[in-house]
């Protein structure tokens, strides 16, 4: 028996294997709210253009709201024979209000533009949700930054001690990464803010519709200017997947350092028991599973981006069934990102900063060497390359004595070019605050950085 809504031109029924293989209902039912939202906007537009009667519009809206209620309450019966959420909702609507009125809803609309509209609405909503979560994470980082302007720790290059910085300066580096993530999402949201609804299959419609009205009802800034582009565009999905991938690049780096810094080799931070797990065999273990899982989930969001890029790379215009595969990766990446940002924020709120361990770690690796070289250039007018060589010799002498250069009692005994003033440089806090360039580790600079981020957050 033929029961598909599109089966009029077919002489036989679809094979059961095809029905199951072709269906996307188990995935795209996530879009039920967006589909109902889009249908109400479309019906409202049709009524304003005289294509639907007022009583027909009222019946359609009432019926769609009943469908929404049934789905939300778990009373809606999803049947894979309905193929997708769009057909499932339309079928149920016709059961509620009758096919004579329900069948008019799809006038001047194709599933091609319907799907694209629903998907865009979901993507737009996801942008806004992710921006909110990133904002909250930045706010947590700012609290740590304000509290730890004088908490000195080593910075690293090549995972070796580089120069002393504050924990405030360190965590602000990640806050600025997240600020860029928000800006990236804002840019993508702006590009996605064009409605494809009314593009129909690919060439528009012969009905005198008002696409601008349905776009306005749905909260879009404008309409897609070309109907063929409207139904075949998935740039908005690619943009979101890329934005999420970059977010995970940043959070994965942070999580990697949280794992390292919480290890017994560093002990810079302590992760709360609330966000740690134990071992099935080793009673002493306290594992940073939150950080490890976020680091691991980075691979799946990268994979979702590559998957959609590959799906779209050679598709002829306009719509192709391949594009049915565009949603699962988005749904997965969005959920993964939201879950990860929420738990990362909760974990960071409770981390303990071990100030003494951080300071003690600064006494390894000769981190004040650059300060000495800069002093020779600035105060003794020595070319930097020569100063670099002189201080390198100081480091060699310190290592020969088994000490850090911060522990040297008299630099002039190693090289007479150093005077008493040079000894003042062998102080981590002095080193921290001696930096004068914009964006540096000094307390004054850190305070400016905090102000920049707070201003950005307030204007969101």
Curated annotation (Swiss-Prot):
One of its GO terms (molecular function) is argininosuccinate lyase activity. It catalyses: 2-(N(omega)-L-arginino)succinate = fumarate + L-arginine. Pathway: Amino-acid biosynthesis; L-arginine biosynthesis; L-arginine from L-ornithine and carbamoyl phosphate: step 3/3. PROSITE patterns: FUMARATE_LYASES. It is an enzyme of class 4 (lyase). One of its GO terms (cellular component) is cytosol. Keywords: Amino-acid biosynthesis, Arginine biosynthesis, Cytoplasm, Lyase. Its EC number is 4.3.2.1. The keyword Amino-acid biosynthesis applies. It comes from the Bacteria. Its main location: cytoplasm. GO terms for biological process: arginine biosynthetic process via ornithine; L-arginine biosynthetic process. The keyword Ion transport does not apply. It holds the Pfam family Lyase_1. PANTHER family: ARGININOSUCCINATE LYASE. Belongs to the lyase 1 family. Argininosuccinate lyase subfamily. This is Argininosuccinate lyase. It comes from Campylobacter jejuni (strain RM1221). The lineage of its organism: Bacteria, Pseudomonadati, Campylobacterota, Epsilonproteobacteria, Campylobacterales. The gene is argH.
């Amino acid at each position: 028996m033929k029961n598909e809504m599109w089966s009029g031109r077919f002489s036989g029924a679809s094979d059961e294997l095809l029905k199951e293989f072709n269906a996307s209902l188990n995935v795209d039912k996530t879009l039920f709210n967006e589909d109902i939202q889009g249908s109400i906007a479309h019906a409202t537009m049709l009524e304003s253009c005289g294509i639907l009667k007022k009583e027909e519009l009222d019946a359609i809206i009432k019926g769609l709201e009943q469908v929404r209620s049934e789905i939300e309450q778990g009373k809606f019966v999803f049947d894979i024979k309905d193929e997708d959420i769009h057909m499932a909702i339309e079928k149920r609507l016709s059961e509620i209000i009758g096919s004579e009125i329900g069948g008019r809803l799809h006038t001047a609309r194709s599933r091609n533009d319907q799907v694209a509209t629903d998907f865009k609405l979901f993507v737009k909503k996801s942008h806004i949700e992710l921006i909110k979560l990133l904002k909250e994470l930045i706010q947590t980082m700012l609290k740590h930054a304000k509290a730890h302007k004088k908490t000195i720790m080593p910075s690293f290059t090549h995972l070796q001690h580089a120069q002393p910085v504050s924990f405030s300066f360190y965590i602000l580096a990640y806050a600025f990464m997240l600020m860029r993530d928000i800006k990236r999402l804002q840019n993508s949201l702006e590009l996605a803010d064009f409605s494809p609804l009314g593009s129909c299959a690919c060439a528009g419609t012969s009905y005198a519709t008002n696409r601008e009205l349905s776009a306005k009802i749905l909260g879009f800034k404008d309409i897609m200017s070309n109907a063929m582009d409207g139904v075949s565009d998935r740039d908005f999905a690619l943009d979101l997947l890329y934005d999420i991938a970059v977010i995970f690049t940043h959070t994965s780096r942070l999580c990697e350092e949280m794992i390292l810094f919480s290890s017994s080799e560093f002990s810079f931070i302590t992760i709360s028991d609330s966000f740690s797990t134990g071992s099935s065999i080793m009673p002493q273990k306290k594992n940073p599973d939150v950080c490890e899982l976020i680091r691991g989930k980075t691979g799946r969001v990268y994979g979702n981006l590559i998957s959609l890029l590959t799906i779209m790379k050679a598709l002829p215009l306009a719509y192709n069934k391949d594009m049915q595969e565009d949603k699962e990766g988005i749904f997965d990446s969005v959920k993964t990102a939201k879950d990860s940002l929420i738990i990362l924020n909760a974990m960071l709120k409770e981390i303990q900063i071990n100030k003494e361990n951080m300071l003690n770690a600064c006494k390894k690796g000769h981190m004040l060497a650059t300060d000495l070289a800069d002093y020779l250039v600035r105060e003794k007018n020595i070319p930097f390359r020569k100063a670099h060589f002189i201080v390198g010799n100081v480091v060699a002498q310190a290592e020969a004595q088994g000490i850090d250069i911060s522990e040297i009692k008299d630099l002039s005994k190693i090289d007479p070019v150093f005077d008493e003033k040079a000894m003042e440089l062998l102080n981590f806090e002095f080193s921290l605050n001696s930096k004068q360039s914009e964006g540096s580790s000094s307390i004054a600079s850190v305070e400016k950085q905090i102000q920049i981020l707070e201003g950005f957050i307030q204007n969101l």
